[in-house]
Amino acid sequence: VMFLGDEQQAIFSFMGAKLDTLDVLRERCKGRIHHLTVNHRSPKYLLDVLNTYASQVLRINADLLPEADNEATCREGELKLLYSDTIDAEYRDVAAFARQLHDNFTEETTAIIVSSNSDAELVSRALRDLELPHFKVSGIDLFSTNEVKLLLAHLNVLANEHNFIAWSRLVKGLKVVETNSAARNFVRSCQNNGLLPSDFLLYEDGSYVQDFVRTCTEKEIVVFDTETTGLNVFTDDIVQIAAVKMREGRVVEGSEFVVFIATDREIPSHLGDIVNPIIEELKHNRQYPHDEALQMFLDYVGDDVLLGHNADYDYNILDRNLRRYCSGIDLHERCPQYFDSLKLMHLLEPDLKQYKLKALLEIFHLHGENSHLADADVEATANVVAYCYERARALLLAQRAFMARDRVKTCAERLRRIYRDLFLDARRRLYTPCAEADRLPLVAELMCFYDALLANGLVEKVDGIGYIEAYLTEDVIDMHCENSLIEQLGRHIMEINTLKEADLCSSSVIRDRVFVTTVHKAKGLEFDNVIVFDAIDGRYPNYYNQTDEGLLAEDARKFYVAMSRSRKRLYISQSLSRIDYHNQPRPNQLTRFMTPILRYFS
């Protein structure tokens, strides 16, 4: 395990982060800690300020402090103290100084770093009075608003239909129920009865589990698996298909099917740490041409229903291979329905930690092995299907009783009315490649859902939605690497879920060169010029933290974070006086944290 961090910047105790954790790691990893010793970003004169502060205020061992890789010396005005008579004057003066930096250094960025959200708003107001374009990062984060969380919840259920939090947000945000607690209870109750909210969208009167039991009872299902040249459903080839037929949870005797397929594409030599067994199998078995082998499988399937483990992958790569090699046969027309034992296990056993085929065989003591050969994997999947069939039959009575409750029927109808068409249309688009000139599928889906919510009065207008759209388009998603919604969700949904407003600051979508940000939001960002606003005792450290040693030390680190956002120039601003509770002027003192570094500033 590797831990990366900088203890000088540990400022999130209010969110539960504890500096004691670093002490534990330091003791645990004694003798095996690597410190980066060269600072490649900061000019030497700025690093001297930060190192002096770290050593004398933060009490960091001088041997652990970095060295500059340059000998840059400070020019006049690059480290400077700024004074204003009062806090009200300081808002105006700092805004005017930011204007000066903006005009004098036309390719550079400037940040005004404040200690509170209210200061950020007042500084922003002063900048607006000067008609100076700027980007404010403070208060409620754009990505933390209920509106944006609702938009992302839609993307999340498309990426993972079993996402409990995303469904809960949708149920509340779409006003199916009134409260967050009620939304969570509804989704949890569905889960406890083998249901997802999507069941109410996919079925008018039934469920995925009920459909599975009915189909297994009335028809034969084809349990199949594929081995392929890779994981891309759009471009990779199938090299083996294996299948068996089942009815009422039992394998139909003599129904085994297997075919190997010739390909000129490269086959991976290893699957993780193991040698890819399909390479040896292909050497010892007849390999059919693509079109012949695929048609053999379709003839075998006939009118039966397909089932696979993680069937979305197998079904869609089969569909793309058919389109490529069999005169454009569309599997969605030929076999429009398929089941997924992975989804069934999620529904029937919602509390498992793993759902891979190998894990299920071990957990439920089922016969078979996950060998990465289609015929062996089909045997294992068939045993999982048999388990699912019996487990599902035992659940049906309770599930139907739950769905018959008036409250559940009311919620289901509301969800259908508001969300069914949006959800089903989006699912149909998941595996549709888009032309290069088109809007990115993920962005198009996000904006389509946003427009629908606006039109139905379910959200207010999101002022920053354009930033999100542009950021995803220009900085996150590469159209040349993934051009379908399913690929873009698979590659980027986790990253999108962790986005913060501050991420926009270092992106190409923010054209502004002046930023207003709180210290906590500034962490991780960097700017050419930094103005630390109103650096007085009472703010650094906070008045209420002065008797608490731990909070006092954290405030010292906050001030370090504020200063260290600078790449070139650093300005410390303060107001000289304030009006006390008795309406009397009182002098302000420059923060005590400046004492050991004051000599560097003019």
Task: Please describe what each predicted stretch is.
Residues 1-52, 538:
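Conserved helicase motor core of SF1/SF2 NTP-dependent helicases
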Residues 9-13, 138-159, 323, 336-354:
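Short alpha-helix plus adjacent loop in nuclease-associated cores
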Residues 28, 105-212, 362-366, 378-380, ...:
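ATPase/helicase motor core of nucleic-acid motors
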Residues 30-32, 39-132, 283, 454:
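Helicase P-loop NTPase motor core
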Residues 160-222, 230, 245-247, 411-517:
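Accessory C-terminal helicase-associated subdomains
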Residues 219-222, 229-327, 331-332, 351-366, ...:
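Conserved non-catalytic scaffold segment of RNase H-like nuclease domains
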Residues 240, 320, 515-544, 570-571:
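A short beta-strand element within the Helicase C-terminal
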Residues 387-388, 510, 536-602:
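C-terminal accessory regions
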